[in-house]
Amino acid sequence: MALFILWCLVAPPVSSTAHPSAHELYDALNALRLDPASTYQLVTANRIELRRGDVEIYFEEGKLAFLAPIDGRITGFVFSGRGHALAFPRDVVEKQQMAHFLGAPVLDQVFLSAYVRFTDDAADDLLRQFHSANLSPQLDTDFASLSDPFVAHLNASQSLRVLEDYLSQNPKPYFYAAIEGVDTGAFDLLFDLQRKEQVLLGQPRKSGNSVYYDVWASYSVPGSVPPPVVFHALDYTMETTVLPDNSLDATAAVHVRAEHSGERLLTFQLSRALHAESVTDERGNPLAYFQNEGMNLQERSVRGNDYLHVVLPQPAQQAQEFTIHFHYRGNVIEDAGNGVIFVGARESWYPHFGDQADFASYDLTMRWPRRLKLVATGAKIDEQIAGDFRVGHWRSDKPLSIAGFNLGEYASNSITTESRIIDVYANRQLEQALSNRLGSPSPDPLPSIDTPLRLPGGRSREAMPPPPPSPADALKQLAKDIDSSIRFYEHFSGPFPFHTLSVSQIPGTFGQGWPGLLYISTYSFLSSEAQNRAGLSASRQEAFTDIVPYHEVAHQWWGNVVGWSNYRDQWIDEAIANYLALLFADSRKPSAHELRVWLERYRKQLQEKVPGSDRPAGEIGALPLGNRLNSSKSPFGFEEVIYSKGSWVIHMLREMLRQPGAKDPDARFVALLRTISTKYAYRAFSTDDLQHEVEAAMTPAMDLEGGRSMEWFFEQWVRGTGIPHYRVEFSTSHTDKGEVVHGKLFQTGVPRSFITSVPIYANNASGHNVFLGAVVAASPETSFHFVTQLPPHKLVVDPQMTLLCTTE
């Protein structure tokens, strides 16, 4: 069928000599329905199947009908009957996740129906099999009519991906199936050569009031080549006006370079709350773009996405540079009450291209109501008053992976040194939700928070509440503490990378660290007394006071200089930033042993079962799963695993590199971090890179398997799950050389092949621990013997907490 004929059926008339526009193609793809004359009746004996990588789909019996062709190509079909889907991931992490969600390390599901879209040769493959099985198409209008609503509902979710291959000179075929499993319900099966991990299996599931996308497996096919980076954003020039109603009216010019030829579609991140008014090229010519097509604002908020897809008029050529201009409006500033406002869509308040390792230059001009103060990333060039507005100009002096701003009726305090300026901003009032908590005699406890302290006689100390605290009261001390943390971190990570650090308050229970700009929770600005009145437990108070602000400071190096490009590598920056925050807390309170306290908390957290599951947090999944750890089975999996186990992994590396008795026992660890922060500045740093750098710095004692390899460590502690449990049995005998200790070390809770070096200490009659030596545990039971001068009262496994484990 001629493509023009199809356009006439589904789109406004166009000239017979005109090429279809991107929107006409998209509308035509959306309008496709089943061709009633292309229906095939299948039986088991036909053995109809499709294989994509290591995924196998069998259509055993039922009906299969193709979508009507477009430009002579078939892009989909619908199947109803009985089929079987199989997948066999080889990666141990993916097997573990399959077992976590499905109860087995493979996909083995019977299904009843499937909606399938593709740009590969699936149609040709099926037609060949139909021909070999002597199957002929039949006319079945009833099947087509019954399927039309189903097809109409699902087409829009896939048509843009089909369109992308139509527009490309170098299409990367894909295959997608929405499958109705007998046991699992509806799930997705994707094989896409445009993705680094070509295979994806998963489904959306509800937990509580939230919907999560459970990724059962996502992995690369052996021998596959990752797709190249096609475009790179070089610089951003943005002019943003914050109107009196807090909405934005903004323009952005994004300067882009094509790294490869032949592509036309670019995908930008832009909040669904912002509406793109126009997208144009350098000459003002309009460019086609797609943003939550066919949805109104209310529909966008419920089922939209935060992406804007732009189509170039012609395929880009390698090394070609061009600028795309955007005009957009909407409201991403949230009102928390009591005059407290903050930026909600911090990642997508402007059209952002690329990932966390795509560094670019930024030039920001901001215009905002005169009564407010505004802070932003970059070096501040100037600020002026223009009527009822203030106008400020910021420009990056270092490459940035992202830009941000925040605003409010702030009080501020500054510290200026020879190398940097630290500005801390806070509201004079509390956000309404927190103010309500402080004004309540007994505020509802936050999750996992202890009951507020009560005074004798059963009267709550909140019975006569004092005046509400002001976050601004903490400005001076917080500025000093942040400056101290920077000085501390510079020893490990090198010079502070920015000239200015702006610290801004944000409602909620989290923090974020953008380049030169921190978003810090209001709780971190409160006194311990106010935190207690708000319902925070002692550990949460310590977290907001001693850890959260300084974790975000550490991100100035780890995340904003050393980047990550793949979700599997995000854990590294989070783990290093968090561990450095623990070290800083420990340095401020040496007698409190903060590092040990937090490591014990993290170990306990990893041992505790996830609510609604029989699994402990330590078995949710491996560190490289990143945000996949958040699922219907573990809504807070990322926080429960990344910060706790990630910190332990960095701690174990530090302990293995440590040189007790040296002038600087941490010299090797410091050298490792400094090498990484220099060598990988302003680019992506991966888990494989980390292993390589650790292997370059490793000591002979770390070489448990030979060959100067740390594969054993990364395979078990990074890509593995579980925490080893140890117990010892021993006996002693007296010899001329001293007391000989014979014993066995028992290792459980991990695979039989698990190997690690376990320090053993003798506890003598006086209660002191004396180091005997390290036992390399390479099986469930390992024998050992040591010689000591005094008979041990008992043997103790790792009392110095150098190893993530439990003991008896």
Map each language-model feature to its residues.
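Beta-strand-rich binding/interaction modules
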Residues: R264-L266, R272-R283, G706-M710, T721-D798
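Acidic/His/Gly-enriched intrinsically disordered linker/tail segments
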Residues: D450-G458, E574, N578-M652, Y680-A681
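Amphipathic alpha-helical substructures
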Residues: H260, M464-P468, A592, N630-S632, ...
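Extended, low-hydrophobicity, Ser/Thr/Pro/Gly-biased non-transmembrane segments
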Residues: G103, D108-V230, L234-M238, D306-V311, ...
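Edge beta-strands of extracellular beta-sandwich domains
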Residues: M801-E808
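Zinc-dependent metallopeptidase catalytic helix centered on the HExxH motif
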Residues: F488-E490, L536-Q607, Y643, L673
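A surface-exposed beta-strand-loop module
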Residues: Y26, A31-L139, S271-F342, D388, ...
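Hydrophobic helix-coil surface modules that form long, contiguous segments used
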Residues: S224-A253, R257-R264, Q269-A273, F353-Y550, ...
